[in-house]
A protein has these predicted regions:
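N-terminal, polar/charged subdomain of small-to-medium soluble alpha/beta proteins
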Residues: 2, 7-97, 113-140
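A charged helix-plus-loop insertion that forms the helical arch/lid used to bind
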Residues: 96-110
């Protein structure tokens, strides 16, 4: 959590990938081809509106190269897919001491509900495929 941020809100870390997959107990639980690996952190004050705004922003984000090599295309433009993985450590507060606290993270039941809601929203916005990790699992 960056110091000085006034309000905590749903966060996503995006990694452009040519292919990604996540496994639980040696079995693949989700995968995607060219597109994004999305690590999603859900905070206590988050709601469906936050998930809607973030999903729409990600779907329209122009970070893929066009024919001239300029980052000018969205995941929709390149026919990409996404893999969404819950990542509560994005909600960590590192400001005091050397041990992070997670007091701002949403309770597991709420976080799981919003993670599923966000994933479903991405399925609507990104028709070429959305894979998922398993909420709360030790993912590999």
């Amino acid at each position: 959590m960056p110091a000085g941020r006034a309000e905590k809100e749903m966060q996503a870390v995006l990694q452009r990938v040519s292919r990604a997959e996540v496994s639980v107990n040696g079995r693949v639980s989700g995968s995607c081809n060219r597109g994004f690996l999305i690590l999603l952190g859900v905070f206590e004050g988050d709601g469906e509106e936050d998930a809607d705004l973030l999903a729409e922003k990600i779907a329209k984000l122009r970070v893929f190269a066009d024919e001239q090599g300029k980052m000018n295309k969205s995941i929709l433009d390149v026919g990409g897919s996404v893999l969404v993985v819950s990542q509560f450590t994005l909600c960590a507060n590192y400001v005091h001491g050397n041990r992070p606290d997670f007091f701002s993270a949403a309770e597991p039941e709420k976080a799981n509900r919003l993670y599923e809601y966000f994933s479903e929203r991405m399925r609507i916005l990104v028709p070429n495929g959305v894979g998922n990790g398993v909420f709360g699992a030790d993912l590999q």
